[in-house]
């Protein structure tokens, strides 16, 4: 796959946008998913979902990235002042400096190194826990949307824990969770018109984005497959148990 095309797919289907996109697409194919919300009230709800699960975490990532770059810049000059040679500093901090170079090319929301993912993932987990509390316990609509928020929150927490030890594709995880949720939803509501094609499109998107992550070199095959298995399992289980 062409790398520019792979980057476009990875950006459009960013993991933090998936919960909102999933609820929106399910509403379009089956409006009863957000009963008793209808029409304008649903879109007000959807905007809040995108804010809580997408916009706020993305802003947090940007702020963390800016702070991260500023910190390394100060560290660089501090080491030079302390008479550490430039060559020595670059050799010791090569992975981090490569990361900065990539981000200065416009990839502000990518985290190529496993160790630099842990703290942002932890903070995003906290935001998702708050979102889950808000949408499940304070402003619950029905058991289906509750299951979606619980599944996505559990996945973010699990990915954070796994990332301490191994790198895993969160793109593959969230999109395969969407596949699992879609399959599970179809089990309980099998009479929805054209639902087979809806699920087929989600499966195709999941496959395309997973391929894109491999094409970009962001993950290897094991990391993508691990994400696919984890996401699908949690998503399907959430819908079965809801």
Residue positions per predicted region:
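The first (N-terminal) embedded transmembrane alpha-helix
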Residues: 10-30
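Membrane-embedded catalytic cores of phosphoryl/pyrophosphoryl-handling enzymes
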Residues: 137-139, 144-242
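Juxtamembrane helix-capping/reentrant segments at transmembrane boundaries
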Residues: 75-85, 107-123
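Membrane-interface helix termini and inter-helical loops of multi-pass transporters
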Residues: 31-40, 106-109, 138-142, 189-191
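Hydrophobic core of alpha-helical transmembrane segments in multi-pass integral membrane proteins
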Residues: 24, 28, 51-65, 122-133, ...
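Short, Lys/Arg-rich, polar N-terminal cytosolic tail immediately upstream
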Residues: 1-6
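Loop-to-helix transition at the N-terminal end of transmembrane alpha-helices
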Residues: 37-56
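C-terminal ends of transmembrane helices
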Residues: 60-78, 96-111, 156-168, 207-219
């Amino acid at each position: 796959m062409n790398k520019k095309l792979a980057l476009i797919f990875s950006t459009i289907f960013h993991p933090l946008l998936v919960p909102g996109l999933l609820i929106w697409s399910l509403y379009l194919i089956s409006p009863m998913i957000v009963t008793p919300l209808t029409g304008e009230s649903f879109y007000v709800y959807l905007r809040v979902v995108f804010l809580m699960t997408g916009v706020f975490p993305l802003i947090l990532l940007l702020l963390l990235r800016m702070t991260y770059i500023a910190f390394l810049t100060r560290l660089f000059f501090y080491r030079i002042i302390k008479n550490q040679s430039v060559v020595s500093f670059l050799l010791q901090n090569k992975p981090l400096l490569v990361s900065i170079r990539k981000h200065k090319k416009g990839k502000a929301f990518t985290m190529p190194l496993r160790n630099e993912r842990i703290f942002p993932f932890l903070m995003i987990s906290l935001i998702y826990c708050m979102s889950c509390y808000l949408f499940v316990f304070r402003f619950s609509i029905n058991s289906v949307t509750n299951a979606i928020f619980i599944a996505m929150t559990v996945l973010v927490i699990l990915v954070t824990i796994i990332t301490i030890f191994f790198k895993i594709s969160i793109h593959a995880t969230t999109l395969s969770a969407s596949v699992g949720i879609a399959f599970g939803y179809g089990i309980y509501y099998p009479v929805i018109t054209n639902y087979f094609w809806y699920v087929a499109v989600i499966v195709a998107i999941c496959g395309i984005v997973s391929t894109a992550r491999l094409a970009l070199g962001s993950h290897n095959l094991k990391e993508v497959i691990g994400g696919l298995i984890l996401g699908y399992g949690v998503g399907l289980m959430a819908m079965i148990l809801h």
